[in-house]
């Protein structure tokens, strides 16, 4: 599996220190990771940074699995459709999400053994974006929980954004887990109608669910309380009425580049992997909270010239970007930027280095300034020597965020992982060296930094800019979902309303949804 014709088996032999010239000379102890390093072992972050043989063998093993699975689906599509063209191919590609999986190794206790290899799709050898052409609907089950199993409806929203992209021009069948989750009672914090609202806002044509029964995985929907079942009934009744009115034409504003290489090759066990995964989720939440219509696209979509549908491309953390060649994609991104597109990326970004020659310099974890001091979070920190300074590190430690204009377009380079900072589980203390200065993490700084960064590509079509309020904008109207624990006032919005749980025409209850039809 190789994205560039310039790479061949000679490169594979070289990076694995193999002194051979014929593939048939290979033995399992030459190329198979578990034979060489033992079952259950994993490479480290140091192996990534130093591009060691250990990393390359893992990568090449996973590449083979991914390509074999892609070829399997391609072959099965041909076989099944040949004799039964009426078949609708919609396999469940994953039981527990994609990329934003629960890191169950940290959740298991004496009652539950460690199933982390089953849950983490980075251990599976699967690229769902690559499989999507061979099914009628590319589909998997989502769980509204972060890697630490804490409830988060935006995880389901983000993964349905992926599915919407995978199924452009086709039926989009969503997937959700209902019931008492094995690691956390998710629906004690979320409601079914809220999640149905999120899937509807993401553009699904319908959905399938998991959790009807089976105590081994939680679920047991038949054992859930009446308030859960009532909420599920309200959500299903609502979406059955709204989806035909809503249609399929969802607006597009911002694209987030799915970190395919990290998804393919880097499991949770690599240090700080969880933070890097959360960086993508954090950027998705930022975009939603600021009202933008956001899609998580892959390099496959850029190669199909779909980047022209968007105003901004956000590149989240991806320390495995170097593991594949991206010559054609990078050329297309450069052309898109020169014609007016905006790229926003974080520290240690291989894409910005290859596309634009922009490379940060590693630096200490230091507060940065935008209107007021902000405490940094994340695991990567860099400063930049060139570009117009948008935010500087405190104590003259250099430029933290810079912007460079490239013909009609712009590149915004961030020295901190703003996405990971936005969804960090904990908030930090003021750094000791800052003594008694007043400063806060980005989520509490009351700075307009994030709004101003995304505002470079224009104002959101939704007109909504509220944390915890998700908006899905379609040609015929808008779906609003209230993820907050407090009601949201919508009296200023025009259009006929259809609530999942109505009280009057102006109040959207916590953890519920509304369809507002365009007048």
Regions found by a protein language model. Name each.
Residues 51-71, 95, 112, 141-152, ...:
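The substrate-binding groove and active-site-proximal loops of carbohydrate-active enzymes
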Residues 204, 221-308, 474-476:
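Aromatic-Pro/Gly-enriched surface loop or interdomain linker
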Residues 85-87, 167-170, 338-342, 409:
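A short helix->loop->beta-strand "cap" motif at the edges of active sites that frequently abuts
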Residues 191-235:
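Helix-enriched interaction subdomains in cytosolic or periplasmic regions
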Residues 94-102, 158-191, 214-222, 258-265:
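Active-site clefts of carbohydrate-active enzymes
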Residues 1, 7-158, 162:
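Polysaccharide-binding and catalytic clefts of secreted carbohydrate-active enzymes
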Residues 188, 317-519:
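A conserved amphipathic helix/loop scaffold
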Residues 89-91, 138-140, 172-176, 206-210:
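Hydrophobic faces of well-ordered beta-strands that scaffold small-molecule active sites
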């Amino acid at each position: 599996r190789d994205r560039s014709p310039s790479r061949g088996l000679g490169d594979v032999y070289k990076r694995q220190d193999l002194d051979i010239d014929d593939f048939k000379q290979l033995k399992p102890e030459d190329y198979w990771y578990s034979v060489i390093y033992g079952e259950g072992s994993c490479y480290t972050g140091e192996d990534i940074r130093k591009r060691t043989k250990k990393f390359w063998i893992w990568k090449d093993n996973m590449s083979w699995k991914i390509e074999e699975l892609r070829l399997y689906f391609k072959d099965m599509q041909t076989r099944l459709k040949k004799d039964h063209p009426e078949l609708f191919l919609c396999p469940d590609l994953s039981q527990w999400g994609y990329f934003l999986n629960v890191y169950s190794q940290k959740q298991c206790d004496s009652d539950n053994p460690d199933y982390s290899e089953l849950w983490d799709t980075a251990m599976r050898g699967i690229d769902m974006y690559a499989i999507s052409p061979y099914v009628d609907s590319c589909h998997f089950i989502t769980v509204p929980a972060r890697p630490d199993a804490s409830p988060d409806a935006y995880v389901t929203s983000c993964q349905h954004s992926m599915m919407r992209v995978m199924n452009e021009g086709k039926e989009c069948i969503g997937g959700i887990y209902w019931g008492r989750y094995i690691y956390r009672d998710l629906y004690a914090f979320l409601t079914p109608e809220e999640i149905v609202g999120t899937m509807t806002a993401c553009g699904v044509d319908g959905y399938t669910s998991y959790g009807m029964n089976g105590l081994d995985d939680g679920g047991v929907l038949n054992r859930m309380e009446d308030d859960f079942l009532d909420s599920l009934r309200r959500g299903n009744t609502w979406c059955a009425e709204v989806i035909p009115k809503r249609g399929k034409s969802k607006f597009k504003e911002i694209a987030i580049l799915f970190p395919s290489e990290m998804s393919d090759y880097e499991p949770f066990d690599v240090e700080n992997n969880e933070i890097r995964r959360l960086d993508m989720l954090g950027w998705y939440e930022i975009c939603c909270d600021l009202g933008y219509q956001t899609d998580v696209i892959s390099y496959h979509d850029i190669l199909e010239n779909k980047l022209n549908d968007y105003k901004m491309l956000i590149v989240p953390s991806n320390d495995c970007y170097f593991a594949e060649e991206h010559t054609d994609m990078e050329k297309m991104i450069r052309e898109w930027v020169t014609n007016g597109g905006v790229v926003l990326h974080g520290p240690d970004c291989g894409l910005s280095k290859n596309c634009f020659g922009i490379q940060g310099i590693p630096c200490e974890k230091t507060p940065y300034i935008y209107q007021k001091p902000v405490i940094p979070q994340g695991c990567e920190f860099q400063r930049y020597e060139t570009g117009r300074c948008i935010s500087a590190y405190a104590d003259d430690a250099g430029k933290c965020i810079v912007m460079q204009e490239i013909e009609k377009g712009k590149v915004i380079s961030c020295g901190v992982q703003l996405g990971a900072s936005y969804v960090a589980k904990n908030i930090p203390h003021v750094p000791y060296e800052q003594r008694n200065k007043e400063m806060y993490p980005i989520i509490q700084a009351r700075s307009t930094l994030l709004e101003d960064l995304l505002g470079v590509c224009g104002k959101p079509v939704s007109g909504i800019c509220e944390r915890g309020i998700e908006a899905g904008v379609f040609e015929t109207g808008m779906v609003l979902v209230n993820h907050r624990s407090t009601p949201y006032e919508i009296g200023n919005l025009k259009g006929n309303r259809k609530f999942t749980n109505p009280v009057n025409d102006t109040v959207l209850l916590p953890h519920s949804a509304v369809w507002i039809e365009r007048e």
